[in-house]
Amino acid sequence: MELERTTIARMLFDRLGDDRLGVRTREQDWTWDEVVRESAARGAVASSLRRDGPFHVGVLLENTPEFLFWLGGAALAGAAVVGVNPTRRGAELEAEIRYVDCQLIVTDTAGKAQLAGLDLGLSEDRFLLVDDPAYTELVAAHAVESPAEDPGIDASTLFLLLFTSGTTGTSKAVRCSQGRLARLAYANTAKYGHVREDVDYCCMPLFHGNALMALWAPALANGATVCLPRKFSASGFLPDVRFFGATFFTYVGKALAYLMATPEQPDDRDNTLVRGFGTEASPEDKTEFVRRFGAELYEGYGSSEGAGSVTLDPDAPEGALGRPANENIVIVDPDTRVEKARARLDEHGRVLNPDEAIGEMVDKAGASRFEGYYKNEDAIADRIRHGWYWTGDLGYVDEAGFIYFAGRKGDWIRVDGENTSALMVERILRRHPKVVATGVFAVPDPRSGDQVMAAVEVADPTDFDPAEFAAFLGNQDDLGTKAAPRFVRVSRDLPVTGSNKVLKRTLQEQRWRCDDPVFRWVGRGVPEYHEMTDSEKAVLEQEFHTHGRQRFLHV
């Protein structure tokens, strides 16, 4: 790898004259030199249309070369790209776009139709449609023969506003400078073995940090090739890998689950993949992927806000992220700031002392590296307290010093005075051969506290056998007595974020009031599930009124 650079703009200039393929689709290829020149033209377009105020460019596109050209163009022009989440709709989408003060929106005809009727505070001439012939002419008119560096761009120049996934709460726009992304490019190169010869398959959305930080930025740093499908497809994954000769890819847990749900073929290992990086995959899916496809998977930990808190260790036990990167990465009680005790694990990896061991992951020295949220001082104050960076994630460290992710802070479920991690329950449910994806969350109990509810995605909900499912749960030795779901929603298609994470806040809002069948644990002792009727749901909700807890039905 070449000399480390401090800005994305400088990294792009390093690729001028580079004739290695930089971007590939099934229809067309571009060398890195061509990528930089395409980027420079779009940067010139953005500069020509710039107005007073924040230089923010919204991009509402699938994974197309235009998205990458606008990333490069923004870097060269000193603008910030706002990746607009295409799964948002209506008032929520309108509010997000207005919140980040976009001067321009780059989209296509389909994306413009999605924005129709929304008051975004922009006139029609502020929308650039990449499939409009006039756009092609505009870009051609701004072609740059000899791209020149802007001396005003430095490591502190804002480059990305990344919306958080919003799985358990409202999305926030994370600030990411050119310098931060450049540092991540080199750090991830060292951590995950990126080299110039890599062919990187970018199947996760480009509006999300997973694809940008773990794939695109390292590819730019090394001059590796980025291959683009428009969006993730489980059935199209292996054909694409073979077509491009891909060596690396990124994933999230649900995407990997979809891959593992495809029928196994005898030639699955006939592919070029070497490794992949992702988060929140079940141990079973990871093991199956390696067996079927022969590539190594790096299961990591990170977020749009911060990264680098874990050091990989090849001796880490199943489920562990690795070791804390330094002495400042600790697990603490969020109320007292006292470091939690080491977790004692049984033979199944279950934490025997969860109340004493599970707490919030913090970085005592991370406050200076956190670049904040755009126009959200309250959220910043929640992240930076007492001079520490608080991740908002639960974790624990075992007696051997390995660190584990235990879910988001909002995933902590308290049942009968005992704490339960939703993530741990999800991992158990994913072992069921028919469960493709799952979300576990708290629902209120009509008398006191919470109960555990699970939503499971299966290929055919009519084929769901509650007795068989109950028997499966009864055979899971690491499922605590308080952790077994009292309610199970069975769906063909769970709601997800644009980055393919199960949207648990939507599930939690709906609870048992949904069109999918919902099963309730009846009796005591061994799990037994009964499908709820509308009248039974009404009776359950009347219990909340009887015990004066009706307010919890509207939370």
From Swiss-Prot:
Pathway(s) of this molecule: Steroid metabolism
Q: Which domain of life is it from?
A: Bacteria
Question: Which residues are the signal sequence here?
Answer: none
Q: Name one GO molecular function term.
A: ATP binding
Q: Which Gene3D superfamilies match?
A: 3.30.300.30, N-terminal domain of ligase-like
Reaction(s) catalysed by this chain, per the record, are: 3-oxochol-4-en-22-oate + ATP + CoA = 3-oxochol-4-en-22-oyl-CoA + AMP + diphosphate; 3-hydroxy-9-oxo-9,10-seco-chola-1,3,5-trien-22-oate + ATP + CoA = 3-hydroxy-9-oxo-9,10-seco-chola-1,3,5-trien-22-oyl-CoA + AMP + diphosphate
**GO biological process entries:** long-chain fatty acid import into cell; steroid metabolic process
UniProt-listed InterPro entries: AMP-bd_C (IPR025110), AMP-bd_C_sf (IPR045851), AMP-binding_CS (IPR020845), AMP-dep_synth/lig_dom (IPR000873), ANL_N_sf (IPR042099)
What is its induction behaviour?
Up-regulated on cholate.
Q: What are the UniProt keywords, alphabetically?
A: ATP-binding, Ligase, Lipid metabolism, Nucleotide-binding, Steroid metabolism
Q: Which family does it belong to?
A: Belongs to the ATP-dependent AMP-binding enzyme family.
Q: What is this protein called?
A: Steroid-22-oyl-CoA synthetase
Name of the gene this protein is made from: casI
